[in-house]
Amino acid sequence: MRKFYIPVIILMILTSCEDYLNVNSPSTFDKDYIFTSESEIATAVNGMYVPMVSGKGWVGNLAQKMLFNTDVEFTTVTTSSNLKESAFEPSAGDISSYGSIWTGMYDGVNRTNDVIEGIEQSPLFEAADKTKPSRLMHYYGEAKVLRAMYYLELVRNWGDVPYRRKPAGNKDELFIGATDRDIILTDMINDLIEVEPVMWYAEESDRGVEAASREFCQGLIARMALYRGGWTLRPDYSNPAAIGSMQRNDDWQKYYEIAEKYAGKVINEGKHSLNRSFRQVWVDECSWIVPVNDDNIFDVPAKVGGSGELGYSWGTYIVSQKNSEGQNASNAPHGYSSGGSKLALTYMLSFDNKDLRRDLTCEMFRYENSGMTNIAQKPIA
């Protein structure tokens, strides 16, 4: 009898284990759940900003690597591979940071595609008035604005790139070729023109300028239209080794007119003014004071203690203070900043002596490890 019962018991246990392992997690929600509630949609909308404030985005590699594009800013390098990397040389020893920007921007694109499709298929969207602003329509516009923002960075830095307007599905569908940049920019501009009237102004939103708003949508239309109508370096696909040539489409004037119209809307609708001094703008920025109706139209919503090295690399040089073990002290009054990114001395000297912006833009001091300030040995900051 014992030999009979043991296999039966084992079979029951295995069957139970299989049933147990196949259960659905109650903490996992599908689109049918998320996009039937405005509060859940808000969570998905917040997720669209994650790549922006990660080390791959505007507080990290995107700012640190892609802003070095003029004769104003520079940083020191010690090896030839660093120089090659800054020139996008394929033989560079480490170009992972550029790859992270690429993946970060497409992560943002896919998140926005998820939200756009989810809202469009939602019963809330079907019942919504699509002719005037509402919370749902604002979320919808916000998703399209952020998608355009991610694509603009891809086009600005890489030109013709893979283009998707739907969420990533079957992995076989991910391997697509590049789309002409003008097609991408045209689509994005048309998307924004469509949603601009149904978005809230920053002063009407509980997130102010730290989220996409109607006036930011207007400004982004103008900016993208200038790119769409401007000159860009086009590749010679018949000869990949060639440098290419500068070109622009015959309809360029149409997009300059769009840029003028929507930049004019930002100005004429009067939602923002320039009441603060140049100094006060930066004092408030460093004090986490974010007015909804002044100089800033959109602030990347980075948080205190979040990831990213923008302030660390581009900020004032703060000498590290060490603890008894030789490590950076956690209780240093000003923290620590490498100040590795600098402005050229010639740029500082281009300011008029009476221009009050000079000494705020080009800092001539650093914080010593005592917490006191001192004149920097090299007059570049």
Please report, for each region that a protein language model flagged, where it lies by residue.
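Secondary-structure transition into beta-strands, especially the periplasmic turns and strand N-termini
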Residues: 4-8, 14, 127-137, 152, ...
